[in-house]
Amino acid sequence: MKQFEEQIERFKQALFEDSDASDSDSSIGEALTNRGLKRKKGSKNVYYGCVGNSSGSSIDIDYYNIGNTKRGVVSHFRRRIDPEWLDHDNPYNDINIAEIMSPLTKPQDLLTHPAISSIFEQNYLSILASSALEIISAEHKYTAHLEQLMVALLGDDPSLPGPPHEVFGISPEQCRELTITVQEALEKSKEFIRCWTNVRMDLLRAIRFKNKVIAYCQGEDYNGNTQVLSKNESDGKPNS
């Protein structure tokens, strides 16, 4: 009981001690990260992503009230009228928000839209479908071994000789327990195959739909034959 009370007392002392306590005489100073400096004073207030440092921010931060929140702005882009302004100084210079967020005006734009075309150009669905097929094939081999073992345990294999009159292997009780275990493993394996088969079928269905969309945007019908889009369709307008 006394040892338990002493432990509680140590916990209380730890709660009320200086949170910045350190066995080092030096401070972390102007460092913006405490990596390798965790034993120095002030290291607790420094972490990756923190603006400034523990001894006082060296960066001028402007605070603005936006709605019910207070936002801090570390830096502002210089105006283009500034003679020292250079486009490559802007990290977002190569990003065209208007082009990325623009809607599709006609089906052909799907193949060149910067934000949407990559979804149809990449072959991740085919890779996932191939991976699912490999998993199903490997599980089929495992299921075949379990079925062979089950046939041997049940004595249904005509190629095997009859059971001996004397028991040289496992006991009948052990054989029954092993049969139940193999049966449960076989059922789980078949359920695993069914689930992965459904996943692969959904992936293949998604691939077919994707190819149909691409074919339509390329001016082809679902069978690959070239079709002529009406003027309204090519302009992105519905037919009247």
UniProtKB/Swiss-Prot annotation:
The keyword Transcription applies. Signal peptide: none annotated. The keyword Plastid does not apply. GO terms for cellular component: cytosol; nucleus; Rpd3L complex; Rpd3L-Expanded complex. InterPro entries: Rxt2 (IPR039602), RXT2_N (IPR013904). Disruption phenotype: Leads to sensitivity to camptothecin, thiabendazole, DNA damaging agents and microtubule depolymerizing drugs. Keywords: Chromatin regulator, Nucleus, Repressor, Transcription, Transcription regulation. It comes from the Eukaryota. Its main location: nucleus. GO terms for biological process: regulation of transcription by RNA polymerase II; transcription initiation-coupled chromatin remodeling. Component of the RPD3C(L) histone deacetylase complex (HDAC) responsible for the deacetylation of lysine residues on the N-terminal part of the core histones (H2A, H2B, H3 and H4). Histone deacetylation gives a tag for epigenetic repression and plays an important role in transcriptional regulation, cell cycle progression and developmental events. Belongs to the RXT2 family. This is Transcriptional regulatory protein rxt2. The lineage of its organism: Eukaryota, Fungi, Dikarya, Ascomycota, Taphrinomycotina.
